[in-house]
Amino acid sequence: RDNTTCDGPCGIRFRQNRXXXXRIIGGQDAAHGSWPWMVSLQIFTYHNNRRYHVCGGSLL
């Protein structure tokens, strides 16, 4: 099986069961640089000089 393909329809997000939404409970903050393949897409707002996390992913 080709690992570069996805089983779902292109351009349509998968439905999630809201009752079984994933959460991290009792986790710990990671040191900067300890997970170099992880990315965080953030939006910077000038009016309050803050960044907001939008989504994340991993570099393959």
Curated annotation (Swiss-Prot):
Top-level taxon: Eukaryota
Broad class of enzyme this protein falls into: hydrolase
InterPro entries: Peptidase_S1_PA, Peptidase_S1_PA_chymotrypsin, Trypsin_dom
Keywords noted in UniProt: Disulfide bond, Glycoprotein, Hydrolase, Protease, Serine protease, Zymogen
A GO molecular-function descriptor: amidase activity
GO biological process: acrosome reaction; activation of adenylate cyclase activity; proteolysis; single fertilization
EC number per UniProt: 3.4.21.10
SUPFAM superfamilies found in the cross-reference section: Trypsin-like serine proteases (SSF50494)
Pfam families registered for this protein in UniProt: Trypsin
UniProt entry tagged with the keyword Disulfide bond: yes
Catalytic activity entry: Preferential cleavage: Arg-|-Xaa, Lys-|-Xaa
Stretches assigned to the Peptidase S1 domain: 24-60
GO cellular component: acrosomal vesicle
Activity regulation behaviour: Inhibited by SERPINA5.
Residues modified by glycosylation: N3
Subunit-level organization: Heavy chain (catalytic) and a light chain linked by two disulfide bonds. Forms a heterodimer with SERPINA5.
Function according to Swiss-Prot or TrEMBL: Acrosin is the major protease of mammalian spermatozoa. It is a serine protease of trypsin-like cleavage specificity, it is synthesized in a zymogen form, proacrosin and stored in the acrosome.
Other observations noted: X's in position 19 to 22 were introduced by homology with the pig sequence.
Family statement drawn from the similarity comment of this UniProt entry: Belongs to the peptidase S1 family.
Cited PANTHER family: ACROSIN, ACROSIN-RELATED
Protein name stated in the entry: Acrosin
Organism field: Capra hircus (Goat)
